[in-house]
């Protein structure tokens, strides 16, 4: 026996249903589409969100909010994530190398969440909340200004 000889056992698989192939199939003649009208025609679909001429929901509701472009190049880092950085100096580039932040990020702020495992020096261009700054300094770390 070879792979090209394999076939399912007779009766184990049902045949694909083919509408419009005779009365006996249960879906002959109109093929389950009913008589006349837009949806009976080929290509007769309506656009998503179309409500038959009534003002669609997405146009009835007001616009709101916006997407901040600042969010694209800024990131928040937890204290516990500083342990992933190799070396004693934490910079934006070292955070990128450790896959803590995205490569597009340009500004970083450290948040008070988790524990500081070791004393680290925080490089220029990295901000920190008051609590995070106090926790880093309590662990023996310092900030380069």
Swiss-Prot record:
Which keywords, in A-to-Z order, does the entry hold?
Ribonucleoprotein, Ribosomal protein, RNA-binding, rRNA-binding
Ranges where the record places region Disordered: 1-57
What does the similarity note say?
A: Belongs to the universal ribosomal protein uL15 family.
- Statement: the UniProt record of this protein carries the keyword Transmembrane: no
Q: What gene is this protein translated from? A: rplO
* General function of this protein: Binds to the 23S rRNA.
Q: Could you tell me one molecular function GO term of this UniProt entry?
A: structural constituent of ribosome
Which superkingdom? Bacteria
Q: How does it assemble?
A: Part of the 50S ribosomal subunit.
- GO cellular component terms given for this protein: cytosolic large ribosomal subunit
**What name does UniProt use for this protein?**
Large ribosomal subunit protein uL15
Concerning InterPro entries, the annotation shows: Ribosomal_uL15 (IPR030878), Ribosomal_uL15/eL18 (IPR021131), Ribosomal_uL15/eL18_sf (IPR036227), Ribosomal_uL15_bac-type (IPR005749)
Q: Which SUPFAM superfamilies match?
A: Ribosomal proteins L15p and L18e
Sorted alphabetically, the Gene Ontology BP terms of this entry are: translation
What are the Gly residues biased-composition ranges? 21-31
């Amino acid at each position: 026996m070879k792979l090209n000889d394999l076939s399912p056992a007779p009766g184990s698989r049902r045949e694909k249903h083919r509408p419009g192939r005779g009365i006996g199939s249960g879906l002959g003649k109109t093929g389950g589409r009913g008589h006349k009208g837009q949806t009976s025609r080929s290509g007769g679909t309506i656009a998503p969100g179309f409500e038959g001429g009534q003002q669609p929901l997405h146009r009835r509701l007001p616009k709101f909010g916006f997407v901040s472009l600042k969010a694209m190049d800024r990131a928040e880092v937890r204290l516990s994530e500083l342990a992933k950085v190799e070396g004693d100096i934490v910079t934006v580039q070292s955070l990128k190398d450790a896959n803590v932040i995205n490569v597009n990020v340009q500004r970083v702020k450290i948040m008070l969440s988790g524990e500081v495992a070791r004393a680290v020096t925080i490089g220029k261009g990295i901000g920190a909340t008051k609590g995070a700054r106090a926790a880093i300094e309590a662990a023996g770390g310092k900030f380069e200004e």
